């Protein structure tokens, strides 16, 4: 089997795993508008009448991507209090607990390997995580007869919430309302019933599944995607500029400098960022450095907040123009992109832009930067020299004091010696102040350099590709999606990346934001990778020439409800030659397993956040004392970071 066919089989396997795992729908009520063609039955006796089958079959065939046919077992009934826009409301919920892949056979036989647990039903319990893990680890083949076991699991996870088995039956919304009219707030019932229905798939899940389908059917895969799945490929580098940390405002640690090098030189790399080690700041540095080297960068994560934090660091901390960075996948994304294009297209004529691009300001800026960097090197060398000399003088004084004893005249000698040394060398504090001022001057010059680089990129794109940019704007203004797709199909998306090289997006929003073009970006950075399942990351990996996976293996992984039996069956179906564990492994596990060069794995080892007493436990027990505690200062050693307070009758 060739490398491409092996990769395609692995993608098809992960596609089915993801589809089975995300076949569950977070339904607050089986009577939701997302559900149609409901058919109820007592537990274990669901049959599909011919007229029902004839109605549902055309729907499933016509909307295979948008809708699915599901079998539901057990329902959690209760009243839920919610607060929206400052107004508290109480509503009755009828949430299915389990769902399965279903067929339109007359007699329904459950495929228990496809069992999924409805997240909404579990979220009704405060101890949701423990409940998820209980059902994930203990799914049973005879789920329809396990009334007592289910009640026991629900009660054990949260004993303060009463739940009882109800014998009530219902066949539609009206009969449900009648059966549970007097239900009390805070008490839940488990109803042993079955139902089948056509359910609308979530848009985000649908997008990932569609792109996985396209990948599985294709034969062109990016290097990072193949390497992540264990392919043995030779490294290839074409015109990649080496990393230059001098382009970044601020001071970087050695590990952060190594990360810059790794992002430039490695096709598949891993950045381990324990809490408080500046992970988001480092990602911002990585993106900015590659931007300054003329490359495009895609930053993705499952966590929307993590993406926003990185964007703020790039624009606010480093001052990169909003016109050079695009936060995609959000509700107002198309409007924001159109505004960006409007701003770019309103620039002055190409003659003026070219004159700006060739203006002497760029060379003058570099000359000033070189001068400041030289001054910094000299000032730092002088500081080290003074420090060592002061250290030597101090040792001499100590020896003199020890040898001559505590004579009165010795104090006068020490005072004279100290004054003589200070007058000749100056205070170390003065040297530090000089270095701080030089760093400030350097950072200001680098900020101007970044701004100049962004302007030059826009000017270059305007001069050579204004027509293409106008085409993108026309596509965004199109009233119908079909018209939009038709315009976009004739455009070169890489041109848009010339003027806006840095893009940030959630994994779920990627499909509606960027075309699935192999190696569209030079670099993709996948943040919070510990929480990312393998399948949802593949479309992002396909879009880049190089990839850096970022996260912390010590943090909690994503939770999957895919059963082991189902995963094993799918693995056998596709005859996988490489073991891929979708259920238990995240993308970061895959990176740790398949990265072969140790130089492609970097750990940020300087902790800046917590007091030493707080982080020391984690450092010693989880990170093998590899973290350097940058908060460990003499002024903090006298403070107690942890206090034990005894509370009576607590």
State each model region's role.
Residues 1-249, 324-329, 343-353, 371, ...:
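Accessory, charged alpha-helical segments in nucleic-acid-processing enzymes
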Residues 158-254, 382, 405-520:
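Conserved helicase NTPase catalytic core signature
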Residues 175, 200, 275, 280-283, ...:
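Conserved ATP-binding/catalytic motifs of P-loop helicase motor domains
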Residues 238-243, 247-381, 385-388, 392:
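P-loop NTPase Walker
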Residues 270, 298-300, 503-504, 525, ...:
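Structural motif
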Residues 375-416:
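Extended alpha-helical coiled-coil "stalk/arm" regions
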Residues 494-495, 508-523, 531-650:
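Conserved helicase motor core of SF1/SF2 NTP-dependent helicases
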């Amino acid at each position: 089997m060739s490398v491409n066919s092996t990769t395609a089989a692995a993608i098809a396997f992960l596609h089915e795993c993801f589809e089975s795992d995300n076949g569950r729908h977070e339904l607050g009520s089986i009577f939701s508008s997302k559900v149609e063609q409901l058919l109820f039955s007592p537990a274990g006796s669901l049959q599909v009448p011919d007229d029902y089958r004839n109605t549902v079959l055309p729907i499933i065939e016509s909307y295979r991507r948008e809708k699915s046919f599901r079998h539901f077992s057990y329902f959690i009934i209760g009243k839920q209090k919610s607060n929206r826009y400052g107004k508290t409301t109480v509503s009755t919920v009828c949430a299915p607990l389990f769902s399965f892949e279903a067929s339109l056979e007359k007699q329904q036989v459950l495929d228990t390997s496809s069992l999924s647990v409805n997240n909404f039903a579990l979220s009704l319990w405060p101890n949701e995580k423990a409940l998820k893990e209980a059902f994930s680890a203990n799914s049973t083949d005879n789920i329809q007869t396990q009334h007592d076991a289910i009640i026991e699991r629900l009660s054990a996870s949260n004993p303060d919430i009463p739940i009882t088995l109800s014998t009530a039956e219902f066949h539609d919304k009206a009969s449900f309302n009648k059966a549970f009219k007097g239900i009390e707030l805070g008490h839940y019932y488990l109803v042993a019933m079955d139902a089948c229905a056509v359910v609308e798939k979530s848009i985000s899940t649908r997008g990932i599944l569609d792109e996985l389908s396209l990948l599985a059917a294709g034969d062109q895969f990016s290097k990072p995607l193949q390497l992540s799945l264990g392919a043995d490929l030779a490294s290839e580098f074409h015109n990649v500029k080496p990393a230059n940390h001098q382009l970044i405002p601020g001071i970087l640690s050695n590990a952060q400098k190594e990360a810059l090098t790794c992002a430039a030189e490695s096709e598949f790399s891993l950045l381990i960022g324990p809490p408080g080690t500046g992970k988001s700041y480092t990602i911002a540095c990585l993106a900015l450095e590659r931007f300054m080297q003329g490359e495009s960068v895609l930053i993705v994560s499952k966590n929307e907040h993590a993406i926003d934090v990185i964007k703020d660091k790039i624009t606010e901390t480093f001052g990169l123009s909003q016109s050079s960075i695009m936060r995609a996948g959000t509700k107002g994304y198309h409007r924001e992109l159109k505004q960006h294009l409007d701003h770019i297209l309103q620039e002055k004529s190409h003659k003026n832009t070219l004159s700006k691009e060739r203006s002497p300001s760029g060379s003058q800026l570099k000359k000033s930067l070189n001068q400041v960097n030289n001054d910094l090197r000299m000032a730092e060398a002088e500081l080290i020299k003074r420090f060592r000399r002061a250290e030597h003088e101090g040792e001499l004084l100590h020896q003199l004091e020890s040898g001559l004893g505590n004579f009165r005249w010795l104090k006068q000698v020490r005072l004279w010696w100290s004054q003589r040394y200070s007058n000749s060398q100056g205070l170390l504090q003065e040297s530090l102040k000089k270095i701080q001022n030089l760093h400030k001057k350097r950072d200001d010059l680098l900020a101007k350099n970044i701004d100049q680089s962004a302007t030059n990129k826009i000017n270059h794109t305007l001069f050579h590709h204004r027509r293409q940019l106008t085409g993108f704007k026309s596509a965004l203004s199109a009233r119908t999606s079909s018209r939009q797709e038709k315009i976009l199909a004739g455009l070169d998306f890489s041109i848009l990346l010339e003027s806006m090289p840095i893009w940030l997006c959630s994994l779920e929003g990627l499909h509606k934001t960027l075309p699935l073009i192999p190696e569209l970006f030079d670099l993709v950075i996948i943040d919070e990778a510990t929480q990312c399942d393998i399948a949802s990351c593949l479309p992002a990996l396909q879009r880049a020439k190089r990839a850096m996976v970022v996260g912390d293996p010590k943090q909690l992984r994503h939770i999957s409800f895919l059963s082991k039996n189902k995963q094993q069956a799918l693995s056998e179906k596709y005859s996988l030659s490489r073991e891929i564990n979708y259920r238990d492994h995240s993308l970061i596990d895959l990176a740790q397993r398949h990265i072969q060069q140790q130089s492609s794995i970097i750990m940020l080892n300087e902790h800046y956040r917590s007091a030493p007493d707080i982080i020391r436990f984690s450092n010693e027990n989880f990170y093998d004392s590899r973290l350097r505690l940058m908060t460990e200062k003499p002024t903090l050693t006298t403070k107690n970071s942890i206090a034990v307070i005894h509370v009576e009758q607590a």
